[in-house]
Amino acid sequence: MAKLKWGMIGGGEGSQIGPAHRLGAQADGLFEMTAGALDHRPEAGREYAQRLGVAADRAYGNWQEMLAGEKDRPDRVDLVTVATPNATHFEITKAFLQAGFNVLCEKPMTMQVDEGEEIVRIAAESGKICAVNYCYSAYPMVRQARAMVRAGEIGKIRLVVTNFSHGHHGDATDADNPRVRWRYDPAMAGVSGQFADCGIHAMHMASFVCDDEVETLSADFASTIPSRVLEDDAMVNFRMSGGTVGRLWTSSVAIGRQHGFDIQIFGETGGLRWASEQPNQLIYTPVGGRTQIIEKGESGLHEDARRLSRVSIAHPEGFPLAVANIYC
């Protein structure tokens, strides 16, 4: 089967998300990276793309060049991934959708409701795929939790509590660090800082696992470091359309927490807990029964969890990267 042609905007050298997309897109031999505009510095972006194997005539200096260069090619890319700063997502996604490209965009897709509605309309009219990368929902044991909820194994959901909090931006001197500073600058990040960066993952996880949508909410945003225009901490209370009560905390100044993304779902007949720092395990407690640890790869999992378990039981999902380290 011929590989799909893939292009990337953003995710340049030194970024965290760029290598994750490049490894992920090409892990199963389904995609080949054939075009890219990888950096806001045109020459750096072109040079890095060529080092990654992109032909010189498809290593672009910016997204506008990439759109102009790809739209009329007979071998144009099949999918464009947008991994640029938040405030640029809407403009880039809209332009590529209107030109007839499929788009996978990093979160958040837009910073305004009307922009989101416009993207939905354009995607529907174009007939093209337009998706947002909520990557944590693809962990096997997250899929197991969702399947258990859907199957009624913990009864009607009463309460969901989720948080995504870390302390890696807790140093006020980070005001001078460009890799941190942009996240709290409205010109680059849009109208939200920490919530758009991490809290949105927690909100999506609540909707995804509970198989329900947020209907109403109230929120308290705070900038605990005075130099920051946008929030570095937020608390959100919400209600879902099915009646579930929700609680969410997200913070980048919670010193001592490393990658504190977890979710707890409490139903009428049981509870579930999953944490990204222990992604191979799902904690299940039936009402009146003993707490159980459900392991990735064990027998009896729901089909979606089995399908996405890429390595055998007791191995971390990062096992192939340990092998990759031997070659580097």
Each predicted region: which residue ranges?
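N-terminal Rossmann-like dinucleotide-binding module
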Residues: 1-54
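C-terminal glycine/acidic-rich active-site capping loop/insertion
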Residues: 135, 208, 235, 240, ...
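Glycine-rich, aromatic-lined ligand/substrate-binding cores of catalytic
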Residues: 59-60, 198-217, 222-271, 276-280
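A structured beta-alpha segment of the ubiquitous adenosine-cofactor-binding alpha/beta core
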Residues: 58-77
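Predominantly a Rossmann-like dinucleotide-binding segment in NAD(P)-dependent oxidoreductases
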Residues: 136-228, 282
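Redox-cofactor binding/interface segments in oxidoreductases and associated redox assembly factors
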Residues: 38, 81-82, 105, 162
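Beta-strand-loop-alpha-helix segment that lines the small-molecule cofactor/substrate pocket
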Residues: 79, 85-138, 152
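Conserved acidic residues
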Residues: 34, 57, 78, 158
